[in-house]
Amino acid sequence: MCIRDRIKNKTTSVSGMGIAGEVDSPVPGQFESMEATLNWNTMYSYATKMMNPNKNIQITLRAAMQNDNKNGGYTYKGLRVVLGGRPKELDPGKLKRADTMGSTTTLEVTRYLMEVDGTTVIDIDKFAGRYYVDGEDMRAEINALI
């Protein structure tokens, strides 16, 4: 399985006197639609089970990231990504002799958590209004006012 996802802030265009042109300014804690596409070699039963629109899907992905150290060797860090959301699309792929099917499942991501070596670096929950980067609440000042 291979996964591809992207986090993109909503932006608003700022222009006016004293600004040389326009600036696309991110709106803190607001995100565009986030999708994750899971690529499968074949049509697994759990890929079709994910298409139940009445269930929220949560997937935990783990990896070991290899880094170069200053002595010419390697160090390793653990990576954990948790995705939560609803199914958007299922592409069963193609049937071709002696080839993979290339099936995909696309999710609308509403929950995104990334940890590196057990430390949370990104934590987004669209429905709960959570947005943390390196442990700092990006919405704290806004939430205190509303």
Please place each PLM-identified region on the residue numbering:
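Oligomerization/assembly interface segments of phage tail-like spikes and tubes
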Residues: V23-Y44, D99-Y112
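Conserved small/polar residues in nucleotide/adenosyl-binding loops
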Residues: M1-I3
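A generic structural micro-feature
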Residues: P28-E32, P53-K55, G73-K77, R97-M101
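Short, acidic/charged, Gly/Pro-enriched secondary-structure junctions
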Residues: M50-G84
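Mixed-charge, glycine-accented linear interaction segment located at domain edges/termini
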Residues: R86-I146
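Catalytic micro-motifs at enzyme active sites that drive phosphoryl/nucleotidyl and oxygen chemistry
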Residues: D24, A47-K49, N69-N71, L90-R97
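N-terminal interaction modules that seed assembly of large macromolecular complexes
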Residues: I7-E32
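Beta-strand elements of well-folded, non-transmembrane domains
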Residues: L38-Y46, A63-N69, L83-E89, V109-M114
